[in-house]
């Protein structure tokens, strides 16, 4: 096999592995959430399909595939069908720039456990997170439903508001690492994780990604008591499943990014690097599930106040303080 063919084969293998692992994790994250919420609420949860209910994600997939693909009268056909894909695909693509382990040596060459080591990896992530907003907007607009439209308007306002604080909270990590490349940011945390230097940025980022995931207490776009199911009210079958899976993939991806920027990525003692990265990422996923089971929903005005009058000003002040400290060094 020629070197070029070998490089292509290695890249395709990494893409296939990430695609399989992320989709499997998303499916079982749904199962884990149902079991954890059941434990919080003092009940059993799904335990009938397979041993300990472990085949429940497969049963859910079969149910979604066999549901009727319903489209409301008056809906914009092509935008209605495009929206679920635009919500799910950017989340998967973001994983391309996340380093999930130390480089391996295969066939006499060093292979990074990362699909694309871009020198603008942070900008790539921010760009894809902006594209995902269009899935929410198109899903509500194309459905010809007042509930869906109101949900998409709320979703747009929320995502745009918290993308700003999320992006600003990452600027100090770039200042400390001196690079936008995610592998360089991980390498800069080999001794001390950035959460030690930037606890405020970490808290701002954590709150912002919870809002980006549209999870309780930030599930304003999908508020069941007000908007039925928000921007995906009119979706059924696998198209609803794409919105659903996209949400859980987003949880995994944003947990991986929080690990990369603040918790040292795959760095850690004793255990293999990939195990460390996975454990940290799944800890964030558990945190999101715990929030859903224990916190109430914010009002819309409280949501906007927190984003624009608290998190964004704090992130700007943190950037100024970090720059001032770096100048004095």
Curated annotation (Swiss-Prot):
Localization: Cell inner membrane
EC number: 7.1.1.-
GO function terms (MF aspect): NADH dehydrogenase activity; oxidoreductase activity, acting on NAD(P)H, quinone or similar compound as acceptor; quinone binding
Cellular component aspect of the GO annotation: plasma membrane
Keyword Cell membrane: yes
Pfam families from the UniProt entry: NADHdh (PF00146)
Bilayer-crossing regions: 12-32, 78-98, 120-140, 159-179, 191-211, 242-262, 270-290, 308-328
The keyword Metal-binding belongs to this UniProt entry's keyword annotation: no
GO terms of biological process kind: aerobic respiration
Catalysed reactions, as listed in the record: a quinone + NADH + 5 H(+)(in) = a quinol + NAD(+) + 4 H(+)(out)
Membrane topology: Multi-pass membrane protein
Entries under InterPro entries matching the protein: NADH_UbQ_OxRdtase_su1/FPO, NADH_UbQ_OxRdtase_su1_CS
Keywords of this entry: Cell inner membrane, Cell membrane, Membrane, NAD, Quinone, Translocase, Transmembrane, Transmembrane helix, Ubiquinone
Family: Belongs to the complex I subunit 1 family.
Function, in words: NDH-1 shuttles electrons from NADH, via FMN and iron-sulfur (Fe-S) centers, to quinones in the respiratory chain. The immediate electron acceptor for the enzyme in this species is believed to be ubiquinone. Couples the redox reaction to proton translocation (for every two electrons transferred, four hydrogen ions are translocated across the cytoplasmic membrane), and thus conserves the redox energy in a proton gradient. This subunit may bind ubiquinone.
Summary of subunit composition and partner proteins: NDH-1 is composed of 14 different subunits. Subunits NuoA, H, J, K, L, M, N constitute the membrane sector of the complex.
Cross-referenced PANTHER family: NADH DEHYDROGENASE SUBUNIT 1, NADH-UBIQUINONE OXIDOREDUCTASE CHAIN 1
Name the UniProt record assigns to this protein: NADH-quinone oxidoreductase subunit H 1
Organism: Geobacter metallireducens (strain ATCC 53774 / DSM 7210 / GS-15)
Gene: nuoH1
């Amino acid at each position: 096999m020629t070197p070029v063919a070998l490089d292509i084969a290695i890249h395709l293998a990494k893409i296939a592995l990430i695609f399989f692992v992320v989709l499997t994790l998303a499916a079982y994250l749904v199962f884990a959430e149902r079991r954890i919420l059941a434990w919080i609420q003092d009940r059993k949860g799904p335990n009938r399909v397979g041993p300990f209910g472990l085949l429940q994600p497969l049963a859910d997939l079969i149910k979604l595939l066999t549901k009727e693909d319903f489209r409301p009268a008056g809906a914009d056909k092509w935008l209605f069908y495009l929206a679920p894909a635009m919500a799910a695909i950017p989340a998967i693509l973001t994983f391309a720039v996340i380093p999930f382990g130390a480089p391996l040596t295969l066939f006499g060459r060093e292979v990074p456990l990362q699909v694309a080591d871009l020198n603008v990896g942070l900008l790539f992530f921010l760009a894809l997170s902006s594209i995902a907003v269009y899935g929410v907007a198109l899903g509500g607009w194309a459905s010809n439903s007042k509930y869906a439209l109101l949900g998409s308007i709320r979703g747009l306002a929320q995502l745009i508001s918290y993308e700003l604080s999320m992006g600003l909270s990452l600027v100090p990590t770039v200042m400390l690492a001196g690079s936008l490349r995610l592998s360089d940011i991980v390498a800069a945390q080999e001794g001390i994780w950035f959460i030690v230097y930037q606890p405020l940025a970490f808290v701002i980022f954590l709150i912002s990604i919870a809002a980006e995931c549209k999870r309780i207490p930030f599930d304003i776009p999908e508020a069941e008591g007000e908007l039925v199911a928000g921007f995906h009210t009119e979706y059924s079958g696998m198209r609803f499943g794409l919105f659903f899976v996209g949400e859980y993939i987003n949880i995994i991806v944003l947990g991986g990014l929080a690990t990369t920027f603040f918790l040292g990525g795959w760095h850690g003692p004793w255990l293999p690097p990939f195990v460390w990265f996975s454990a940290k990422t799944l800890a964030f996923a558990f945190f999101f599930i715990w929030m859903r089971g224990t916190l109430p929903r914010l009002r819309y005005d409280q949501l906007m106040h927190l984003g624009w009058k608290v998190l964004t000003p704090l992130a700007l002040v943190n950037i100024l303080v970090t720059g001032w400290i770096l100048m004095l060094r």
